[in-house]
Amino acid sequence: MRAKRLVAAATAAVLAAGIVAIATPATAAVNICQAKNVKEAGGLDNLIKLAKKEGKLALITTPRSWANYGAIHDAYEKAFGVKVTVDNPDGSSQYEIDTMKTAPKSKQPDSIDIGPLVVAQLTPPGSKPLSSPYQVINWKDIPNAAKDSTGLWYGNYGGKLAIVYNATLSPTPTKASDFSKPEYKGFVGITGNPTSSNQAFMSVLAASIGNGGSKNLSDVTKGLELYKAVKAQAPLVSVNGTNLATGAAKLGFMWDFNALGIIPAAKAAGLDLRFAYPTDYVLQAPPYINAINVK
């Protein structure tokens, strides 16, 4: 099963790196089950050939509006003729980990995209890793702090938290403490459950720091207090692409790389969405993590 996961996911990583035109010489003997880089897989041409033969790439929790994944999926299908499927696009990082642990093989993803807060669960003490060691083609360009030395996981992309808001809001929100203002009652939201969603947790952390709290990940008291005050005024709205594009949500934190993709979609629907970095504190978190499933 590792061979199947590796072929599909490793080829996808090549495309994401923007270097699909590179070809590497094939080796004389290839054991794809043991390959830990493109050379050991028989070269890029062989890897692409095997991916085309498989014909599908199973992903999980990678919505089209997230980090330009929609365009990446389309480009992958066009370049290789491989069908991309995505399980639970709007799920959380914890959902991905839980799926790897408990889902039957037919429901297992080839590759995962998770927040750094759950990466330790890929290598549980005393148990076998949930991921396979593989060094993607641009491995040397990834900082050591953003990857496992053996290739069990690696950082792929990252960004800063921005305030996304509907231009109809007045006054214009500029910092986390603005969220509790009565002018924004019923419009403020969060991207998910902070206990399972990396983006949601980082939103609480940013709100905490912006309100004079600690920068320690283990103490987000000030942020929780802020969202509690907001919720006391009106229920929190889910800050996602659909709600922002329809006007159901008008204010919240979001990664800048996601805001950049949602704003054009909202414009097409006749809404003026904007984003700006908070004036009190700008949070840049560690990169999101990719890994190849071992199952």
Question: Each predicted region: which residue ranges?
Answer:
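C-terminal region of N-terminal signal peptides and the immediate post-cleavage residues
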Residues: 2, 18-33
